[in-house]
Amino acid sequence: IYQQEKDWESAIEIADQMGFVGEQPARYVIAQFYCELAENARARDKTDEAARLLKKAGEYFPHCARERHIAANIARQQGDYRAALDALEQVAERDIELLPEVLDDMHACHVELGTEAAFIEYLHDAITRYAGISPVLALADILSGVEGSESAARFIAGELGKRPSVRGLSRFIDLSLSRSEGEAHDNLTILKNMTDQLLANKPVYQCRNCGFYGKALHWQCPGCKHWNTIKPIHGVEGD
């Protein structure tokens, strides 16, 4: 009831007396409650309060990826891009499935710090650890700017053989369109429209507990109400 009403303080008080909340360990769930409170504090620009609440979340669940994600957002707001980058890397270390959620922010931090070469190294390593297409596309975007669209397209083509992906194919077509003419350009445009239509109506996330599908990341599944069970969908039509 307290969860439904978003009365997180009362929810913490009750959960702290329990071993489990539903099927999930109470300490794990309480960390999420503290993250909710920290998000609320951040929205009110109460960064000191948010930091205190995040510390509590970490005490209950030391490997909480969400806690690091919120900390990264606070650090970016304050212009501390090194701290933000460290926190974002910890998000992916604690839950590699959240890598797609932090790549854009990581890149932005590296740009601010002037360390884009380090980001390229990070992406090469991430590609070996993460089965999805997101780090491949992030690296291809950088290659396109540095070495040109042909180099980026060649890189994506090589990776598509290892991890078939409609998103990857769509980006490959984008890069190829700029270098094509006549009938080849027309055919690529048709293929691009088809891939866009395939992606437009596809969910991006799925709950690992109940199977709920969605296009946005929810920290609590709207279906089964479990915490941190919604992850990116993998495979040809996913990440």
Predicted regions and their residues:
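Alpha-helical repeat scaffolds
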Residues: 10-19, 46-56, 82-92, 115-129, ...
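Cys/His-clustered metal-coordination modules, chiefly Zn-binding fingers
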Residues: 161-239
